[in-house]
């Protein structure tokens, strides 16, 4: 793994094509024309987001009321395509960052930095570096983890596990953090920290999945910006992220007429609904289908596996800039499939044994009052959010599709719902969409515009943002379920 310095806005993991490596040896910063990074998203035309914002005055009110930065940042602009959800998001985020709670304000922002650093999300790191200083944080802490108090350092292990393999968290991890001593965490403090970590891991998925651009610097007036290479290769940036690479456009991103693709999806939804009404699968059959889907997720390639294509123009180079690495311990630790090939692995997390509604919600509310209500409202909002449309079709019940997206994320994290037929996942989620979901959820820093464009090509950008919101909240809930279950076991 190479390491190098970078600008303060540098993000980290990215694929390097051979030609660009030569350029990067000379300068980690590449001068590109400002129009290539104009607007809140590199994936969504600026006019689509701007139109939504000008029409909806509610967004401006929400920003004034709940934004910690006091301005309409790029995340908020993209989320404003779904104003109902945006309100739930901003209220919960404002509560965990600014309202009364167990942790001091600077700690909250430093924990956000630590969480974002696990996915090398410079956008969030920069945002919370500013907020950390504004709330009275000690500037020396920004030099890296070796400069922070030991009790913050002690969060590294649970931060790492939550971000990449939450199923490994046990009550022993909790006991280690709350044991008696000068650096111990109280349970309310730990719950607050866990909520922040899960929130910012998941938000990093949204940032990369939606192609959120760096905030514009008002001091730049010459039409050019020095930007650091993010999760795109340099030639992606120069060509608006349109990679001309056969290895990325083979069987994984099969070219299908997008109209017939949409009609086929609609037909599958209709057929599944009819089958569901005709007969109900047995519990044994449902369990078998979950295990099958869990194992099949092993073979869904994600962003990092593009490296393994033979004779690819991409090389297995990962650069973590010093600006990000200072906040990370064990940078090589990442996601591994819950069901690894040829191995007897960890037992499946049966959602019915520890649910958010019956267990997690009450524990969070008991130890960190009111955040449970805000999180619950946000989870319900995104899960039930619908406009009853699919691309150009109206009066469509999308419940089945939303549930498949949510449950597929949980499946990759080893969480099973006894009452869900996982055969529906294979019927409803095409391979290119599964690639996108796995990358955004498990390796968000590797998401590319090509992947975003490759699925549901007839759908509106607002519908794809809705997908990203579902993925973000499904991921956050999965992390919380594992962490809160471990805390519950510690208490019993």
From Swiss-Prot:
EC number in record: 1.11.1.-
GO molecular function: L-leucine binding; oxidoreductase activity, acting on peroxide as acceptor
Entry protein name: Sestrin-3
Residue numbers binding L-leucine: 386-389, 398, 463
Subunit record text: Interacts with the GATOR2 complex which is composed of MIOS, SEC13, SEH1L, WDR24 and WDR59; the interaction is not regulated by leucine. Interacts with RRAGA, RRAGB, RRAGC and RRAGD; may function as a guanine nucleotide dissociation inhibitor for RRAGs and regulate them. Interacts with the TORC2 complex; through RICTOR.
PANTHER family: P53 REGULATED PA26 NUCLEAR PROTEIN SESTRIN, SESTRIN-3
Domain comment in the entry: The N-terminal domain may have an alkylhydroperoxide reductase activity.
A GO biological-process term: TORC2 signaling
Keyword Cytoplasm found: yes
Tissue: Widely expressed.
Coiled-coil ranges per UniProt: none
Enzyme active site: 121 (cysteine sulfenic acid (-soh) intermediate)
One Pfam family of this chain: PA26
InterPro entries per the UniProt record, alphabetical: AhpD-like, Sestrin
Cellular component terms (Gene Ontology): cytoplasm; nucleus; TORC2 complex
Primary location recorded for the protein, binned into one broad class: cytoplasm
Keyword annotations of the record: Cytoplasm, Oxidoreductase
Known role: May function as an intracellular leucine sensor that negatively regulates the TORC1 signaling pathway. May also regulate the insulin-receptor signaling pathway through activation of TORC2. This metabolic regulator may also play a role in protection against oxidative and genotoxic stresses. May prevent the accumulation of reactive oxygen species (ROS) through the alkylhydroperoxide reductase activity born by the N-terminal domain of the protein.
Residues covered by region (N-terminal domain): 62-243
Region (C-terminal domain): 310-492
Family the entry assigns: Belongs to the sestrin family.
């Amino acid at each position: 793994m190479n390491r190098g310095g970078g600008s303060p806005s540098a993000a980290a993991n990215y694929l390097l094509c051979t030609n660009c490596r030569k350029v990067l040896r000379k300068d980690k910063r590449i001068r590109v024309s400002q129009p290539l990074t104009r607007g809140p998203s590199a994936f969504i035309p600026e006019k689509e987001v701007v139109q939504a914002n000008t029409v909806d005055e509610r967004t401006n009110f929400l920003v004034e009321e709940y934004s910690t930065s006091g301005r309409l940042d790029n995340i908020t602009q993209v989320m404003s395509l779904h104003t109902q959800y945006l309100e739930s998001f901003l209220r919960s985020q404002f509560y965990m960052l600014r309202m009364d709670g167990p942790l001091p304000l600077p700690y909250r922002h430093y924990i956000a930095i630590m969480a974002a650093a696990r996915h090398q999300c410079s956008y969030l790191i920069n945002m919370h570096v500013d907020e950390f200083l504004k709330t009275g944080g000690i500037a020396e802490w920004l030099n890296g983890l070796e400069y922070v108090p030991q009790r913050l350092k002690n969060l590294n292990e649970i931060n790492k596990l939550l971000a990449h393999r939450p199923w490994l968290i046990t009550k022993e991890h909790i006991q280690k953090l709350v044991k008696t001593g000068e650096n111990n965490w109280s349970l309310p403090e730990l719950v607050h920290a866990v909520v922040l970590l899960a929130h910012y891991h998941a938000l990093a998925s949204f940032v990369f999945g939606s192609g959120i651009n760096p905030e514009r610097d008002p001091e730049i007036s010459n039409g050019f910006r020095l930007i650091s290479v993010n999760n795109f290769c340099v030639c992606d940036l120069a060509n608006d992220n349109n990679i001309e690479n056969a290895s990325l456009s083979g069987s994984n991103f099969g070219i299908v007429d997008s109209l017939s693709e949409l009609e086929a999806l609609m037909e599958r939804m209709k057929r599944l609904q009819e089958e569901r009404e005709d007969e109900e699968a047995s519990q044994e059959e449902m369990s078998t289908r979950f295990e099958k889907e869990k194992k099949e997720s092993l073979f869904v390639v994600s962003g990092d596996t593009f490296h393994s294509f033979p004779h690819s123009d991409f090389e297995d180079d990962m650069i973590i800039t010093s600006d990000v690495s200072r906040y990370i311990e064990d940078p090589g630790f990442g996601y591994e499939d819950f069901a690894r090939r040829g191995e007897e692995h960890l037992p499946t997390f049966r959602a019915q044994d520890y649910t958010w509604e019956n267990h997690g919600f009450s524990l969070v509310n008991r130890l960190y009052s009111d955040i449970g209500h805000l999180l619950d409202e946000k989870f319900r909002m995104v899960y039930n959010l619908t406009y009853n449309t699919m691309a150009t079709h109206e009066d469509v019940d999308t419940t089945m599709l939303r549930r498949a997206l949510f449950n597929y994320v949980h499946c990759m994290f080893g969480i099973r719902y006894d009452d869900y037929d996982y055969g529906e996942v294979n019927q409803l989620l095409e391979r290119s969409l599964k690639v996108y979901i796995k990358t955004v959820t498990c390796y968000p820093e590797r998401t590319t515009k090509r992947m975003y464009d490759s699925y549901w090509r007839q759908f509106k950008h607002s519908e794809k943002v809705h997908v990203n919101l579902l993925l973000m909240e499904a991921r956050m809930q999965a992390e919380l379920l594992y962490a809160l279950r471990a805390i519950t076991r510690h208490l019993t």
